[in-house]
Swiss-Prot record:
This is Protein Ta0487. NCBIfam families: PRK01215.1 (NF002291). It holds the Pfam family MoCF_biosynth. It comes from Thermoplasma acidophilum (strain ATCC 25905 / DSM 1728 / JCM 9062 / NBRC 15155 / AMRC-C165). Belongs to the CinA family. InterPro entries: CinA, CinA_Arc, MoaB/Mog-like_dom_sf, MoaB/Mog_dom.
Length: 256
């Protein structure tokens, strides 16, 4: 199984001004494309912090995806932080420069705009269909790093445009869930372990939807990865059925 990590960069996230929806979107996207997302980082706009996040993420990941810090301002330093991490210098990339010129038309190429065309040699730019700063796909010792803007619409559009570079053809992810009523999470907890032992390779997570001791209701989510999509789906569906059986055994009811 391939592992991935997600890095989001920005002081605005850490101080709570901006809700980190990018991490959720990227994590979901990677999971459904066959990756086990191992780690998530949120770091401030600081070269050392950014470089540290990439370095630690690359230790455990086949793919690292970052968002934020690609713009023209002084605190947009993700590319520089990544370059520092891998020991490369930034240089003007002609393809990236052409993308920037196309976006700004007759406007002057100020140092701030030119900054967005400076990338490490191991990266190639991907045109941003929504904004100005190109996204980057980088190769690092057999691993892959994708660097995206922080504006959600730009990030989402670029990530989808890079789908062919991300997808793992021989790995599938599937999940399903069942809602059970009148069973407390603490009462169902032993059966979570039992289901995971009975159906090897799946993950079972209980999500409380109400107060534990007053009208308890749980969503039991079951997920897994596998090479055989049909077999994986059947395993998950069988495990869902078993969860329902245990709920009834505990005096509850299945709402799904």
């Amino acid at each position: 199984m391939k592992n991935a990590s997600v890095i989001t960069v920005g002081n605005e996230i850490l101080k709570g001004r901006t809700v980190n929806t990018n991490a959720a979107f990227i994590g979901n996207f990677l999971t459904y494309h066959g990756y086990q997302v191992r780690r998530g980082f949120v770091v401030m706009d600081d070269l050392d912090e950014i470089g540290w996040a990439f370095r630690v993420a690359l230790e455990v990941s086949d793919l690292v995806v970052s968002s934020g810090g690609l713009g023209p301002t002084f605190d947009d330093m993700t590319v520089e932080g990544f370059a520092k991490c891998i020991g490369q210098d930034l240089r003007i990339d002609e393809d990236a420069l052409a993308m920037i010129k196309k976006k700004y038309g007759q406007a002057d190429l100020t140092p701030q705009r030119l900054k967005m065309a400076k990338i490490p040699p191991s990266c190639r730019p991907i045109e941003n269909p929504v904004g100005t700063a190109p996204g980057l796909i980088c190769a690092v010792g057999g691993k892959k790093v994708i660097i995206l803007p922080g504006v959600p619409k730009e990030m989402e559009a670029l990530l989808k445009a890079m789908e062919k570079d991300i997808i793992i053809p021989d790995t599938h992810y599937y999940d399903d869930s069942v809602i059970i009523a009148d069973v407390m999470e603490s009462a169902f907890a032993p059966y979570v372990d039992r289901i995971m032992k009975e159906f090897d390779g799946i993950y079972v997570k209980s999500h409380p939807r109400n107060v534990e001791v007053k009208n308890p209701e749980l969503e039991i989510e079951i997920s897994g990865f596998g090479e055989d999509e049909a077999a994986l789906r059947k395993k998950i569906e069988d495990a869902i059925a078993r969860a329902g059986e245990y709920a009834v055994k505990l005096g509850g009811s299945v709402k799904r």
